[in-house]
Design a protein with these regions (language model features):
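Catalytic domains of riboflavin
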Residues: 2-404
Length: 404
């Protein structure tokens, strides 16, 4: 779960932003079910050789420079690889050094100069050389509201502090080389007099001030399971449309039954028996209608986020003996690329606060919390297996942690 219940342990986002604005360093802690790590973070425009040396000496992790996509494009810095297979899809770009006035590029002073250039609005591609000793990271549009990672947190904090949208981060490791976890991070913050916050609190801070989805239209939708209101939403990040089916009065109600369902054309529309998606969708509609009120958020995340064409290619690999996870990995994808931040914002827009979540996937709970939603119960969604999807369901249980 996210660390937000321990708010008294952490500094407010307002205090953290003030320190970033003053050129100071802070510690940002992420989700215990994600990396469960803390990073040193500061605005790139405030970098000094002493700051780089502190990160290298006391942080001990990889010093990286998160930036908005537009900034990296302006500097002519491309992705390191075309197919990102890193565990948390950290978007590494080609490493760089300053083109002039450095030695080997690795010293604290050299790296500080390179980072300074990356934050300069007037900098151009010729001001940098590739490869180098500084590692740029691309932050997702929408920041932590789109992806709850340190990359996005660094850029968001810089932006909130009225700095340029370029940050610096470095993971914090213990003396023995292991990753520092929350107890060690709290001691580290106290020892070095650094503010410490969580990504969950940053999400909450932004969520209460910004919204990345907008409701476009609402229509009546009579179905075999009852009458629903169908709400059309548009993402302000990428223009993608998502849907919310609402049964009954849900705004301001407590413990509303909710299903966040990712699009599956083959299962939802064609009734494919290779998966359980279509059966789960119809069962969710049945349960929501039976409860008297509830919401089904229909997210356009075909094929666990890889898209329709790659999913069909993954099906072909499954016919050759690969399971669903192995097929994704064979194509260069992680086993699950879905994200639930926009789905959470849709639920908040509908007036929900406490929900009963229809899911067999514990990771979905992590993806929704931190956006002002409290999940008071995980409700299993049961559908009967068939001979065509038995192996698929076994893989979901054994490799993806689904509670089946």
């Amino acid at each position: 779960m996210l660390f937000s219940p321990m708010k008294k342990t952490f500094d407010s986002i307002e205090l953290v932003v003030k320190d970033i604005h003053r050129g100071k360093m802070v510690i940002v802690v992420d989700d215990a079910d994600r990396e469960n790590e803390g990073d040193l973070i500061m605005a790139a425009q405030s970098v000094t050789p002493a700051a780089v040396n502190f990160m290298a000496k006391f942080g001990r992790g990889l010093i990286c420079v998160p930036a908005a996509a537009e900034r990296l494009q302006q500097l002519g810095i491309d992705r390191m690889v075309q197919q990102n297979r890193e565990s948390f899809r950290t978007d590494f770009h080609v490493s760089v050094d300053a083109a002039r006035s450095i030695t080997t590029g690795i010293s604290a002073a050299d790296r500080a100069r390179t980072i300074k250039i990356m934050a300069e609005p007037a900098a151009v591609p010729d001001d940098l050389v590739q490869p180098g000793h500084v590692f740029p990271l691309r932050a997702r549009p929408g920041g932590v509201l789109q992806r709850a990672g340190h990359t996005e947190a660094a850029v968001d904090l810089a932006t909130l502090a009225a700095c340029r949208p370029v940050g610096i981060l470095c993971e914090i490791m213990n003396d023995d080389g292991t990753m520092a976890r929350l107890p060690q991070l709290l001691k580290f913050a106290k020892k070095h007099r650094l503010k410490i916050c969580t990504i969950a609190d940053l999400i909450e801070h932004r969520r209460t001030r910004e919204k990345l989805v907008e409701r476009v239209e609402t229509v009546k939708l009579p179905t075999d399971y009852g009458d629903f209101d169908l709400h059309l939403y548009r993402s302000k990040v990428d223009g993608q449309h998502h849907l919310a089916l609402v049964h009954g009065d849900v705004a301001g109600r407590g413990k509303v039954l909710v299903r966040v369902h990712s699009e599956c054309l083959t299962g939802d529309v064609f009734g494919s028996r290779r998966c359980d998606c279509g059966s789960q969708l119809h069962q969710a509609m049945r349960q929501v209608a039976g409860a008297g009120r509830g919401v089904i958020v229909y997210m356009r995340q075909e094929g666990r986020g890889i898209g329709l064409a790659p999913k069909i290619k993954a099906y072909k690999l499954q016919e050759q003996g690969y399971d669903t996870v192995e097929a994704n990995q064979k194509l260069g994808y992680e086993m699950d690329l879905r994200e639930y931040g926009l789905g959470a914002q849709i639920l908040v827009d509908l007036g929900l606060k406490t929900i009963r979540l229809l899911t067999n996937n514990p990771k979905k709970i992590v993806g929704l919390e931190g956006y002002g939603l409290k999940i008071v119960e995980q409700v299993p969604i049961r559908v009967k297996p068939n001979p065509h999807n038995e192996r698929y369901l076994k893989t979901k249980r054994q490799k993806m942690g689904h509670l089946l």
